[in-house]
Amino acid sequence: MARNELRPVIKLRSTAGTGFTYVTRKNRRNDPDRMTLRKYDPIARRHVDFREER
């Protein structure tokens, strides 16, 4: 398998509406659904949910 097929690069966009994004990789075999992580948003200055953007 090619490198990009199993662990694609995804963007995690803030749900606070600031437009801030994190970029990470995810394993499609373990997490086939859209990922949601609670991370720090420096624009909002608090922890918010970040959802996977395709």
From Swiss-Prot:
Domain of life (superkingdom): Bacteria
Any one Gene Ontology BP term: translation
Family annotation (Gene3D superfamilies): Ribosomal protein L33 (2.20.28.120)
Record's signal peptide: none
Molecular function in Gene Ontology: structural constituent of ribosome
Keyword list, A-Z: Ribonucleoprotein, Ribosomal protein
Pfam family, one: Ribosomal_L33
GO cellular component, one term: cytosolic large ribosomal subunit
UniProt cross-references to PROSITE patterns, sorted A to Z: RIBOSOMAL_L33
Family matches, as PANTHER family: 54S RIBOSOMAL PROTEIN L39, MITOCHONDRIAL (PTHR15238), LARGE RIBOSOMAL SUBUNIT PROTEIN BL33M (PTHR15238:SF1)
Family: Belongs to the bacterial ribosomal protein bL33 family.
NCBIfam families associated with the record: PRK00595.1, rpmG_bact
Protein name: Large ribosomal subunit protein bL33A
Taxonomic classification: Bacteria, Bacillati, Actinomycetota, Actinomycetes, Kitasatosporales
Gene coding for it: rpmG1
